[in-house]
Amino acid sequence: VIQIGCDPKADSTMNLLGGEPLRPVMNYMREEDEEPEYLEDIAKEGFGNVLCIETGGPTPGLGCAGRGIIATFQLLEDLKLFETYKPDVVLYDVLGDVVCGGFAAPIREDYAEKVLIVTSGEKMALYAADNISKAVQNFEDRSYARVFGIVLNHRNVENETEKVQNFAKERGFDIVGEI
C-alpha cells in the first residue's frame, strides 16, 4: 500500500509515521534546489508497511499547489515508484476543495480507477465530498476514475448517519464502510 498526501498541509501520513512529519516533495525540491535521485529521499515506510509520500506545496503566496502535485506525480513516474513497489492499493489523500485541476490529477490523470470519498456529517466535510464527486463527474465521459462509494467517518455530529446517507442517496452512491 502506498499513501500519497496531495494537500499543501502535508499532514496526510503523519499518523502512519507515529506523529513524525514527512519532508514533502516540494520542500525537498525547494530546499535542495534539485529533484531527488531516489524514492528513499522523499518516501518513508510507516505503520503496516504503508509507503508514505507527501506532495506539499509552494512557498505561501508564491506558486501553485496544484502544479506542485502534477510535478510530484511526474517525478514519481520518473523514479519508477509504481514499477518498483508494485502496490495493490494506492491511496491519494486529496484536498476537498478540488477547485484546481492540479488537485484533481489523481482522478483525471489515470492514476486512480476508483474513488472512495471519506466524509463525516460535518457541513464542510460534506461540502468537500460534494466537490470531489463533482470533479469525478466532470471526467466521467473520459473513462477516468469513478466514485466507488462513501466511507462514513463518524465525528459524533447530530444526525450524522442520516446526513451522510441522504448525501450518498442523492448522488447515487453507496456507503461502503464506516469508521
What are these regions (language model features)?
Residues 12, 53, 72, 93, ...:
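Residue-level signature of catalytic and energy-coupling elements of molecular machines
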Residues 69-78:
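Conserved helicase/translocase P-loop NTPase motor core
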